[in-house]
C-alpha cells in the first residue's frame, strides 16, 4: 500500500483513493504532502457515483466484472491490475486492454516472467502519468468514452432497451 501511496504522490495528479484496509496507515507526512491533489477515503463508497463524475479521468482497478462495466459505461479508461490469476480478473484485464483498447496494463510479471507480488511506486507513477496525459492515455480515453456512449445509447428509448421493454410487455401480457 505504501508503494501505491508513493506512486500516486510521484505522479502529481489529482486522485481519489478508496482504501478498504483497516490496518494500513499512510507513511509519515504523506497525507500532508498530497492534501492538495489527493483525497483518501477509508470507508465504503458508491463506486458508480464516483465513476460517473465528469472529473474522473481514470480508474485503477482489479478488473472485477462490475468494476469494468461501471467504468466503461461511464467512459472512464482503466489502469488494469488484476489481483487474482485464477479469477475472471486477468481475462477482464486482457479484454479491456487488448480487446477493447480502453485501458493500460499495470505489469503483472517481471522481465523473467515471474509474478510481481509487490508493485513498485515508479510503475504506478509511470502508468498513471501515461493514462492521464500520455499519447496512449489519450487513445484509451477516447475509446473508453466511445464505449460509454455506445452503452448509454443501448439503453436509450429506441435502443436495445426498447426491444427489452417489448419482450417484458409480451411476457407480462402472456402470463395474465
Predicted regions and their residues:
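Catalytic core of nucleotide-sugar-dependent glycosyltransferases
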Residues: 1-176
Amino acid at each position: 500500500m505504501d508503494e501505491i501511496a508513493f506512486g500516486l504522490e510521484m505522479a502529481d495528479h489529482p486522485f481519489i483513493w478508496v482504501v478498504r484496509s483497516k490496518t494500513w496507515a499512510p507513511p509519515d507526512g504523506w497525507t500532508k504532502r498530497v492534501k492538495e491533489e489527493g483525497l483518501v477515503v477509508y470507508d465504503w463508497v458508491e463506486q458508480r457515483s464516483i465513476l460517473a463524475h465528469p472529473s474522473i479521468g481514470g480508474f485503477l482497478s482489479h478488473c472485477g466484472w462490475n468494476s469494468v462495466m461501471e467504468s466503461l459505461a461511464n467512459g472512464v479508461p482503466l489502469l488494469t491490475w488484476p489481483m487474482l490469476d485464477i479469477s475472471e480478473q486477468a481475462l477482464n484485464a486482457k479484454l479491456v486492454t487488448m480487446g477493447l483498447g480502453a485501458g493500460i496494463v499495470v505489469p503483472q510479471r517481471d522481465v523473467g516472467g515471474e509474478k510481481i507480488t509487490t508493485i513498485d511506486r515508479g510503475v504506478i507513477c509511470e502508468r498513471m502519468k501515461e493514462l492521464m496525459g500520455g499519447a496512449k492515455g489519450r487513445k484509451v480515453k477516447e475509446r473508453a468514452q466511445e464505449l460509454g456512449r455506445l452503452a448509454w445509447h443501448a439503453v436509450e428509448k429506441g435502443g436495445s432497451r426498447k426491444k427489452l421493454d417489448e419482450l417484458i410487455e409480451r411476457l407480462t401480457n402472456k402470463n395474465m
